[in-house]
Amino acid sequence: MDLTDDSPDGEVKIHKKDFHHPYTPYPIQEKFMQTVYDVLEQGKIGILESPTGTGKSLSLICGSLTWLRDFKRKEFEGILNDGFENSEEPEWMIEAAKVRKKRELIGRREEMERKLGRIRERERCERDRMSGNGNGNMRGGKRRKVGGDGEGDLVGGSNGSNEDEFLLEDWESDGEIGGSGKKKTGDEAIFSKETLELKKSIGMWKFPSPMPLEEFPSKTTEKDKDNLHEHLRHLPLGSRKNLCINPKVNKLNSVTAINERCAELQQSSTPKEHKCPHLPNKDNKPLVSTFRDHALATIRDIEDMGALGKEISICPYYASRSAIKPAEIVTLPYPLLLQKSAREALGISLKGHVVIIDEAHNLMDAIAGIYGTEMSLKELKLAKEMLGNYFMKFAKRLKGKNRIYVAQAIRVVDSLMGYLMKRLEGTEIDGVVDQKELLAGKGADQIDLFKLIRYLQESKLARKVESYTEHTRNIKQASTIPHNNKETPKSTTPILHTLTSLLLALTHPTTEGQLFFLKSTSTSPSPSPDLITLKFQLLNPAPHFESIVSSARAIILAGGTMSPFSDYTSILFPSIPSHKITTLSCGHVIPKTHLFASTVSRGPTGIPFKWTFANRGNTDMMDELGRVLLNVCTIVPDGVVVFFPSYNFLSTILYRFSIPSSGTGSATATATGTEKGKGKTILERLSEKKPIFQESKEESVETILAAYAKSIAEGKGALLFSVVGGKLSEGINFSDALGRCVMIVGLPFPNMHTAEWKRRLRFIEESAVERLTSFYQEKESNNKDGNGNEEEGNGKKKENREKIQRDQILQQAKGEARDYFENVCMRAVNQCVGRAIRHRGDWAGILLLDERYKGERVVGKLAGWIREGVLRGEGMGMGDAGGFGRLMGGLGRFCRGRREVL
C-alpha cells in the first residue's frame, strides 16, 4: 500500500493515539508514527521515508514502543486467560485463580523494576557525587581494578626464539564443511553521533507499563502513578572488537584475529592459567546477573558496555547475551544483524520479533559490502611469500594433512597470480572472471576448494602465518637496527584472511554474485602489480536477507532518502505480495516559503547543460557553469555547496576554471557585463566573492569542514566543491548558514560500460524475465479447463500469443534494469540535496544543473518534498522555464525575503 497515493486505500487515518512523544508532534510525525504502529500490528513490511530534520528517528521509537507496550498488554491478558477457557471449575474459583496468577505476574514485573530502579538511583547518586568533587569520571564510581589475565604472551607478541607457538595443531577432519566463514566487516562503525545522542535522550522518558493499569486501584498518588510507567530496557550489542576487555586480545589488529584468539582461549586444550579470566562460567554466574541488571537499568552506548564489563570484571561480549531476552530494544550494527551466523553466535532469534532498520537507504550496499571482497595482485604476491616462508620453515615439522593443505593454498595463490598477470598484459581494463580459467594453473582446479576453505577457517593457518611473519620481521628489525626504539607499525590488512574470503566467494552460486578483474587507470608506461585486482561483487542480496524476512513478525526500513522505492520491493522482497508492503513518503516540516528548488537547464548565455559522459569535456559548458556559479555566489549569502558526479570530473572543472580568461565571451566577462575580469581565472573571480574549499580523497572531512564553517562564521561566506558519493555527501549536515544553496551538477549515473555494471544490469534483467515468465505461465494455466486443455479458440493463437508474451516480458525486464540504474543515480541526488535543510526553521535553495532534470522520469524519482518544490517554482514562473535571468531574480528575492525574516 503506497501511502503517498490520493486514493482512499492509501490514506492514513490519524486516530490521535497517544504515542508518548516528548514534544508536540507535527502532523507528518503523527502520520509517520501511526504508519509504524499499523505496520507492526498487521505484521507487514514498511518502507518509510521522512526527510532529515523531521524527527524521523524519534517518531520511529515512539511509534514502535507504543505498539510494543500495547502488544505486551494484550499478551499479558492472553496469558491470564490461558488454561481457563474450557475449565469446568466454578466461576468464583476461576476468578480467584486468575487473580493469583495476575498477582504473581505483576509481582515479578514490579520486582524487576524495583531492582533496576535501585541501580538507577545508585548510579545517579554516584554521578552527582563525582561531579560534585570535580572528578571527570561520569560513568560511575571508582572502578574495580581488573586483574591480569593470567595469560602468556600472545602469538606474535614476543621476539623470543621459541617458534613452536606458530606450529599448526594436527589436522584430522575431512568431514563436511561447518560454519559460515563469512567475512565480517564494518564492526568499527556502530552508531552515528546523532543516534547515540537520541539513545541517551530516551532514558529521560518512560512508556506505560505493559501491565493493565486497572490492576492498581490503590495507587493514587502522583508517585504511585509514575510507578505505573516503566523505563525502557535497551541493550546495545557489538562485536568482540568493540567489547573485548582482555588487553592481550583486543590489541590485535583485525576483527578476525580477535575472534580467533578469543575462541582459542576457550578451547579445552588451552591450559587453565592461559584461559581468559573474564569469560562467564559457573563460578561467576552472579557477575553475569549483575552485568545484565546494570546493562538494562539505564540507556547505554557500546562504550558504556565495555566500561561496565571492566568494572564488574566480566566479559561484556558474552555477558550481554543474558540481557537479550528481557530487553525491549536491541540495537546492533549491520554485520551482526544481516549475517545469520553472527545472529546465531550472539543467541539472537528474530522469530516473532520486529526488525527496524534506520538509515536504510544504504541497506543493499551494506549487504553487498559484507559478502563482497577483493584482493590485488600485490596482495596475492605477499600472501604467496608469507605462505612460502612459513612452509620452508616448518615443512619438516608439519604433520600429515597440514603439509598437504598449506601446499594446496600456495598452489591456489599461484594460479590466481598467473591469471591476473596474464590479464595485466591484455588490453581489457576490466571483465568477468571465468572460474575455470582462474584455477587452471598449477593444477589448482583439482583441489577441493570446500575442504581447503574449511581447513583455512578451522586450523587458524592465516593467524599462524601472519603472526610468524610479524615475528620474523621483528627479529630482523631488532638485529639490523639495534638502537632504534621505534616500533614498526603493524599491518592493518590481514592478507591471508582476505584470501580466505576470496576463496569463499568462489564457492558462491553465479546467480548470487560475480567475480571480476579490474585494472586501475595509470599513465605509467610499466604497469604495477597494484593496478589489477580480483573483486567479488554480490549481485543478489535477497537470499542473505531472506532469513530475516521469513523470521521477523514485521520489518520497517526507514530513511530520509528512500525514494525511489521500487528497488527495495523488487530486490529485497521479491516474494512478498504487494498488499503486504506499505510505503510512505512524508513531506518536510518546513513551510513552503523556506525552499527554493529549480532545475537549471541552461546558463546566462543560453548554453544548455547536459552533462553526459560524452559532454563532460565540453569547455563551453564548463565556462557556462562558471558564469552560473558567479551569479549564484553573488546572490546567495553564507555557504554554497556544489556536488559533482565524480572526483575526476571535479578535477577537470577545476583545471578549466584555473585557465585565465581572454575577456570577450569568457565566463567572467559575460557574467559581469564588463571587461573587469579580463585575464583572471574563474577560480580567482569566484574567490573574490567567497573563499573556495574543495573535497579531496586525501584531506580529512573534519579539516575541510572546520575551515569552511570558520569562513562562514567570519562573515566571508564560502563555496564548497564536493563529490556525489564522496565524504561530504552523506552524514554531514549543511544546516543553516552552512548550506544556503545546494547545487547538483549533472546526473551522477554510474558508468554502465564497466564489466561490473554490465553484469549487474544483466542480472536485474534476467531476474525480471524469470519472475515475469513464471507469472505468465501461472496465468496461462488458469485459462485451461479442468482437463488441462486450452479454452476454445486459444489454441490457434497460441504461437502468436507466446511471441507477444516473450516480447512483453523482455521489454518489461529491460525497463526494470533501466529503472534500477536510474534509481541508483537519483537516490544519490536525493541524499546530497537532503544535506541542506535540517530543521523546521532552516531554509535553502536547491539548483539541479542539467536539462535532463526536466524529464518526467527523472523528476518523478526526486524525493517528494524536492519534487513539489521544483514543480511549485515552475508553476509560479520562478523556475527555469522563465529563463536564467528570471530564475536568478526569483532566487535573489527568496534569499532576501528569508534574511529579512531572520
Swiss-Prot record:
Phylogenetic placement of the source organism: Eukaryota, Fungi, Dikarya, Ascomycota, Pezizomycotina
Protein's job: ATP-dependent DNA helicase important for chromosome transmission and normal cell cycle progression in G(2)/M. May have a role in changing DNA topology to allow the loading of proteins involved in maintaining sister chromatid cohesion in the vicinity of the centromeres. Has a specific role in chromosome segregation during meiosis II.
DNA-binding as UniProt keyword: yes
Cellular localisation: Nucleus
Needed cofactors: [4Fe-4S] cluster
A Gene Ontology BP annotation from the UniProt entry: nucleobase-containing compound metabolic process
One of the record's GO cellular component terms: nucleus
Basic and acidic residues biased stretches: 793-804
Gene Ontology molecular-function annotations: ATP binding; ATP hydrolysis activity; DNA binding; DNA helicase activity; iron-sulfur cluster binding; metal ion binding
Family that this chain belongs to: Belongs to the DEAD box helicase family. DEAH subfamily. DDX11/CHL1 sub-subfamily.
Residues at which [4Fe-4S] cluster binds: 244, 262, 276, 315
Catalytic activity: Couples ATP hydrolysis with the unwinding of duplex DNA at the replication fork by translocating in the 5'-3' direction. This creates two antiparallel DNA single strands (ssDNA). The leading ssDNA polymer is the template for DNA polymerase III holoenzyme which synthesizes a continuous strand; ATP + H2O = ADP + phosphate + H(+)
Sequence segments annotated as region (Disordered): 128-162, 775-804
Record's keyword terms, sorted: ATP-binding, Cell cycle, DNA-binding, Helicase, Hydrolase, Iron, Iron-sulfur, Isomerase, Metal-binding, Nucleotide-binding, Nucleus
EC number: 5.6.2.3
Protein name (record): ATP-dependent DNA helicase CHL1
Source species: Sclerotinia sclerotiorum (strain ATCC 18683 / 1980 / Ss-1) (White mold)
